[in-house]
Amino acid sequence: MKIEMICTGEEVLSGQIVDTNAAWAANALMDHGIEMQQRITVGDRLDDLVEVFRQRSEHADVILVNGGLGPTSDDMSSEAMAIAKGEPLVECTLWRERIQEWFTRNGRHMPESNLKQAMLPASAIMVDNPVGTACGFRVKLNRAWLFFTPGVPFEFKKMVTEQFIPFVEQIADSHIEVEVQKLLTIGQGESALADKLEGMPLPDGMTLGYRSFMPYIEIKLFARGEAAIGELDRVKAEVLTRLGDAVVGHNVASLAQVIHNGLLASGKRLSIAESCTGGMIANNLVAFAGSSNYLDQGLVTYSNESKVRVLGVKPATLDDHGAVSIATVEEMAKGARGLLDSDYALATSGIAGPDGGSEAKPVGTVAIALATRQGVYSQMLKFPARSRELVRQLSTAVALDMLRRELQESPVLVDYSSYPRFAR
């Protein structure tokens, strides 16, 4: 089965917004054993939309169309589909009532323009959008089913998950059982990981892939069919053996998720004192509901004065070693932990750039410490200085990994081949 995606919108085509919907959809489909063969982006021009609907419907079996279902003049997907099919737009009474109910329920007057969202090609089959006013629908043209979804990300994701993927699985010629295992890694480049996995035999029906999304590289094992699935645990164990300390999570999207789960399970509490990461560590954790059960505080102690007055860092430590030093982050971590008697505290201080570096401590130099009730672990690393954001992301990842290792009773300090460690 050949599956494609058509993304619509002038702002997407011109690069004014990043098309996160397309990337998310391709990954979600892959997790279900569904591979997308092609993706096309088209602006808000009626003739171009009509042409691409007609053209791609002769080559694909299923086309996921995203965007252009709103109430404004530049939302043209329904009209373009009707023209491509050679049929009129007709009002979907059920959806008109749904829109009216939505506005009434939210205590708002419905603008006349919203009625446009109930106008569908005559042969369209309505696809429910339970969280918005844009009506989804599907239409058969030539060999393809075109499946229309709104551009609003949370509406799109819900419809793809609950409507589109089940539809594709239903019309597929045969359903092959699929299982995916994902291993999250940090600290090694994609080529280094590939070298370690080079020559590892894979059984028929199993593939291995890489996905880089800073600060992580995800290793994905994809098994199709009962025989390949039966070998998945064995192959995964071999990958873990070959990659060793690089693997920091299993079937999770981030290290923060690992820490969240680990702290909830342990009943331990955490404080954070951040300088160069500027609240990024805390932000990663509070994204998860329930983080209040373990997060005592997140402090951004950016200035030397705040390090001294809030965390109790000794002025002499700053004078002798500087703000970016193992001595300073150790005192930051101890001070943060002591404020509320937390079980753990993380601290960061570094040079995120683009300025501020020196020969001894170039841009990308970051000191990180983890304080526990038993003592303090610390290290100073040199991260790639390609951007300020990257330095902060990598610093956050290593800090969280140090805590992960402590929670899992593993050695807290390990070598990351991509991030050289300064001598103490």
From Swiss-Prot:
SUPFAM superfamilies, sorted: CinA-like, Molybdenum cofactor biosynthesis proteins
Top-level division of the source organism's lineage: Bacteria
Coiled coil: none
Position of the signal peptide: none
Matches recorded under CDD domains: cinA
Similarity section: Belongs to the CinA family.
Annotated protein name in UniProt: CinA-like protein
